């Protein structure tokens, strides 16, 4: 069983033996993680990356940056609630445990989408399709002949790419990437297994190049290994991942409804009914009374959204505490939100169904997905040809455009593909 004393580690990736720098008495190590992320260029670039809807014209909807900030706020609240309960249960954890846990979850929430390519989740699908059924298939034999994992590309995953972005030493950069704490890094790894375990769902947590980093994290934090010596690497989740995942799910499920209302995809009555379904009967009665004074429709939807999130956060924290032993033992299955009680369980399922039927399959979202597929295909065709044939005149001009932190002189086919994906996934929708 995992234990909290070992799970909270301020050891930094890539800085394990580094000396000097002095202490920072104004901030904890985990608060430094948060600040380091906020001040980083990759985090700022999230403002020009799509969340669900195309980047706005006259109506401002969520992008990756605003979504990540909101997820971080929810994560902070969940961390505080869970940390308080655990500190009460285990007094030996110390007075800083609650604040440390909250800071870790909040920082991880900021970072959870930093590995996602442009055009939302459709960008991930476009990259996977390129190597599954597109022109990228031509490189499969070479990658496998090198002993590398082709599945790293056919199942391209933003979560695995975030781990690479945050920990890999790119050219001219320091060891350990962002040099974040082990606990913060572990909190973003939703799928702690290799792409060989991805199967039909296509999810995994680390590329072959980051497998050693995953092993180091697991050893330092005491994660439970689920795979045998001769099997693809697989671990039980780091416990705080459940809080990061829940924060993300709460925000995108609820906020997508508000955005859809603002874009007139959902009517006021539809949005109101979806959001109010998360509330208990007594709170719905109070809400109707309050709405006699609040006549602005946008204000009403905003209020309902905040109450729905609050109700979900409070119950999610309780679910974590109730299942803490299963989580620490590595046997908890599903996400925390799958254990919601009524009426929130039915409300969440209905919210997800409406989102799929009316939002994710809406014309504007489908048009963006088609555009992303076309753009990614063109970019990958040109970049991979240039990387394979750098002596060509056009190739040299194209590779000169690639940031110097990416190694365009990679000799392996796997390395060249990773170079192209590092560059493309760091782009914004507008780039």
What positions do the PLM features span?
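Acidic, low-complexity proline/glycine-rich segments
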Residues: 31-44, 340-346
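Amphipathic alpha-helical core segments of compact helical bundles
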Residues: 124, 128, 132, 314, ...
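Charged/polar positions within long, soluble alpha-helices
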Residues: 80, 167, 252-255, 259, ...
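A short small-residue
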Residues: 49-59, 354-359
């Amino acid at each position: 069983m995992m234990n909290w004393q070992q799970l909270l580690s301020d050891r930094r990736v890539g800085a394990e033996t580094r000396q000097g720098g002095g202490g920072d008495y104004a901030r904890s190590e985990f608060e430094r993680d948060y600040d380091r992320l906020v001040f980083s260029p990759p985090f700022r670039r999230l403002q020009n990356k799509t969340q669900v809807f195309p980047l706005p014209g006259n109506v401002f909807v969520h992008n990756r940056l605003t979504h990540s900030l909101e997820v971080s706020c929810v994560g902070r609240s969940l961390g505080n609630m869970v940390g308080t309960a655990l500190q009460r249960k285990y007094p030996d954890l110390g007075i800083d445990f609650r604040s440390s846990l909250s800071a870790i979850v909040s920082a991880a929430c900021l970072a959870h989408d930093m590995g996602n390519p442009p055009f939302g989740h459709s960008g991930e699908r476009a990259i996977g399709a390129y190597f599954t059924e597109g022109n990228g298939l031509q490189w499969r034999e070479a990658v496998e002949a090198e002993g590398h994992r082709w599945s790293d590309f056919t199942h391209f995953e933003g979560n695995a790419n975030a781990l690479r972005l945050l920990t890999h030493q790119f050219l001219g950069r320091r060891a350990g990437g962002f040099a974040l704490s082990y606990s913060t890094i572990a909190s973003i790894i939703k799928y702690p297994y290799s792409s060989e375990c991805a199967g039909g769902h296509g999810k995994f947590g680390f590329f072959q190049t980051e497998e050693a980093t995953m092993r180091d994290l697991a050893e330092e934090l005491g994660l439970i290994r689920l795979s045998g010596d001769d099997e693809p690497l697989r671990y039980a989740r780091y416990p705080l991942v459940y809080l990061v995942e829940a924060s993300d799910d709460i925000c995108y499920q609820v906020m997508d409804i508000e955005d859809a209302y603002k874009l007139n995809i959902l009517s006021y009555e539809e949005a109101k009914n979806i959001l109010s379904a998360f509330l208990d009967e007594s709170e719905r009665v109070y809400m109707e009374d309050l709405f006699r004074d609040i006549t602005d429709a946008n204000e009403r939807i905003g209020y309902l959204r905040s109450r729905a999130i609050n109700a979900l956060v409070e119950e999610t924290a309780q679910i974590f505490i109730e299942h803490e032993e299963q989580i620490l033992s590595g046997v908890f299955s599903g996400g925390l939100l799958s254990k919601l009680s009524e009426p929130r369980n039915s409300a969440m399922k209905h919210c997800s169904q409406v989102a799929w039927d009316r939002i994710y399959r809406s014309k504007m979202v489908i048009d963006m997905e088609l555009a992303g597929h076309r753009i990614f295909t063109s970019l990958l065709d040109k970049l991979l040809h240039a990387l394979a044939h750098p002596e060509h005149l056009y190739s040299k001009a194209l590779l000169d455009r690639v940031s110097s932190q990416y190694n365009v002189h990679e000799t392996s086919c796997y390395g060249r593909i990773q170079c192209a994906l590092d560059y493309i996934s760091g782009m914004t929708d507008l780039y």
